[in-house]
């Protein structure tokens, strides 16, 4: 038996295989059930013990050489296939890069951050509170009586469960509950804004079931309505970055302030010139609310205001439909990037 010839033939056959399928077929000629080396191993049983031992060792060495040649060719074909695939996917580094588009803040979040920045610059703290609120903090503490229409299911989202004192839970209808929460944890003078999400059963071009609001509160011994007018007028001029803004305070009613006022603004120039635009509710904090804060209404007084962040954003950017802020249309949002 010429084992050297078998090994040489196998190496030559493997080297000539152009692909894995051909290589596996060539492998069967030498290592398959009827392969040359397999037949030699089957024939060892006919030999005497001494010869069988010697020939068996020679055949095993030849088999190892054939398997080594087979594995080497397999690796070479795999490497060639990989190189071919990489070449097909090659990147021309001389081409101009496409780049990834940079993200940007949502326009309402831009307003949120801008409002915080402006009020921080004039000494206000920024606070946050729970969106799932108790009936007491959302209504009772703010001087809303038990039979107030806002407590109805048609205006307020109530949730299952009650608080530790057995009071109903709801999605807060405004950020005003933070007035009482913050004042109970801090002593006057209190200057704070509380931006956050609020919820009401309402949906049209100017209202959304979920909207963002910023509450402002200033409590001290000698805070007047004149301070409210000065602070809010200065805020509007900084927010809109223009001085041609007229502000008026219309008498109104809110259970948590007395006197109460709606704040309107008007631009002297531009496409909205001459139009009064409702911007916020405000007023002097009601003595009952101050008492619920744990403070003496005979000593402390202050003002509060509540402004819709979507409303401010609509006026700043000239958006006509509030619902556009919630549709996640990139064509709309990219305008503010």
UniProtKB/Swiss-Prot annotation:
Domain of life (superkingdom): Bacteria
GO molecular function, one term: ATP binding
Requisite cofactors: Mg(2+)
UniProt binding sites for Mg(2+): 258
Reaction(s) this enzyme catalyzes, per UniProt: tRNA(Phe) + L-phenylalanine + ATP = L-phenylalanyl-tRNA(Phe) + AMP + diphosphate + H(+)
GO biological process per UniProt: phenylalanyl-tRNA aminoacylation
CDD domains: PheRS_alpha_core
Subcellular location: Cytoplasm
Keywords in alphabetical order: Aminoacyl-tRNA synthetase, ATP-binding, Cytoplasm, Ligase, Magnesium, Metal-binding, Nucleotide-binding, Protein biosynthesis
Pfam families documented for this protein: Phe_tRNA-synt_N, tRNA-synt_2d
EC number of this enzyme: 6.1.1.20
A single GO cellular-component term on record: cytoplasm
Note on how the cofactor is bound: Binds 2 magnesium ions per tetramer.
EC main group: ligase
Family the UniProt entry places it in: Belongs to the class-II aminoacyl-tRNA synthetase family. Phe-tRNA synthetase alpha subunit type 1 subfamily.
Subunit structure: Tetramer of two alpha and two beta subunits.
Name of the molecule in the record: Phenylalanine--tRNA ligase alpha subunit
Organism from which the protein derives: Burkholderia pseudomallei (strain 1106a)
